[in-house]
């Protein structure tokens, strides 16, 4: 008799973390170049990525106790 294969859900927190780091770096560089609209957009991108990371970490915590 075949056994059902258990499928593990992988939650990636590292990608949003790296995306946030990149967005913050881009925001900083935009400020240095005087591109304030771009800086504000990149800052918002960083916030979105941090929120995704927070959700992934919360999910991991719930799964691991």
For each predicted feature, which ranges?
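Short amphipathic alpha-helical heptad-repeat segments
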Residues: 12-23
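Short intrinsically disordered terminal tails
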Residues: 1-5, 60-65
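Short, charge/polar-rich alpha-helical segments
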Residues: 2-14
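Short, charge-rich amphipathic interface segments used for partner binding and complex assembly
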Residues: 22-64
């Amino acid at each position: 008799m075949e056994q059902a294969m258990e499928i593990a859900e992988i939650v990636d927190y590292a990608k949003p973390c790296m995306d946030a780091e990149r967005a913050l770096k881009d925001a900083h560089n935009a400020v240095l170049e005087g591109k304030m609209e771009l800086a504000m957009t990149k800052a918002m991108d960083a916030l979105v990525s941090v929120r995704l990371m927070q959700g992934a970490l919360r999910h991991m915590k719930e799964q691991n106790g």
